[in-house]
């Protein structure tokens, strides 16, 4: 479970992150990263904030929940790699349904590396 200080808590935070942030995709996930979350009172103290989007295209409810749990553990383990004021949305793609936790971790890390090169 993500601690509340590391969760995106409302639709405005998701919307701003997806629309204003940078994006990097891999085969199983798309990472939306918004480093300037301090604009418009979006950021609060406590470190980076994460949100997950796992749509019905990924699979049935059991599959979506499993993918969500895997991604939650991946982002919490990587939280120190993100600036404290950043917002991150991880969107799962249909291939995430059959990916292992290690594959998801590798794809999130590769997307983060790509975003770091863009900055």
From Swiss-Prot:
InterPro entries: Ribosomal_Su5_D2-typ_SF, Ribsml_uS5_D2-typ_fold_subgr, RNase_P. The lineage of its organism: Bacteria, Bacillati, Actinomycetota, Actinomycetes, Mycobacteriales. Coiled coil: none annotated. This is Ribonuclease P protein component. PANTHER family: RIBONUCLEASE P PROTEIN COMPONENT. Belongs to the RnpA family. Pfam families: Ribonuclease_P (PF00825). Consists of a catalytic RNA component (M1 or rnpB) and a protein subunit. Its EC number is 3.1.26.5. It catalyses: Endonucleolytic cleavage of RNA, removing 5'-extranucleotides from tRNA precursor. The gene is rnpA. One of its GO terms (molecular function) is ribonuclease P activity.
